[in-house]
């Protein structure tokens, strides 16, 4: 069994199960919140670079 931080007591089955559930919850949040946010930021950067580097044609 795993020792908890700062103490001599060991982790119980219930604590281990709760820890695993928390880890799964965090991974799910990663997929639903963090990755789409990074995607939007990346897309904004791509659009900004595209708009700043496109050739401009001056009308006569």
UniProtKB/Swiss-Prot annotation:
GO cellular component: membrane
Ranges of Basic and acidic residues composition bias in the record: 8-23
Major place of residence: membrane
Annotated segments matching region Disordered: 1-23
Keywords of this entry: Coiled coil, Membrane, Transmembrane, Transmembrane helix
Alphabetized InterPro entries for the sequence: DUF4519 (IPR027960)
Membrane topology, record value: Single-pass membrane protein
Subcellular localization: Membrane
Parts forming coiled coils: 8-33
Regions crossing the membrane: 31-51
Annotated family: Belongs to the SMCO4 family.
Name listed for the protein in its UniProt record: Single-pass membrane and coiled-coil domain-containing protein 4 homolog
Native source organism of the sequence: Anopheles gambiae (African malaria mosquito)
């Amino acid at each position: 069994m795993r020792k908890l931080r700062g103490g001599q007591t060991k982790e119980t089955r219930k604590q281990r199960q709760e820890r695993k559930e928390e880890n799964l919850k965090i991974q799910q949040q990663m997929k639903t919140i963090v990755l789409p946010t990074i995607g939007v930021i990346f897309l904004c950067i791509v659009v900004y670079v595209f708009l700043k580097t496109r050739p401009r044609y001056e009308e006569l």
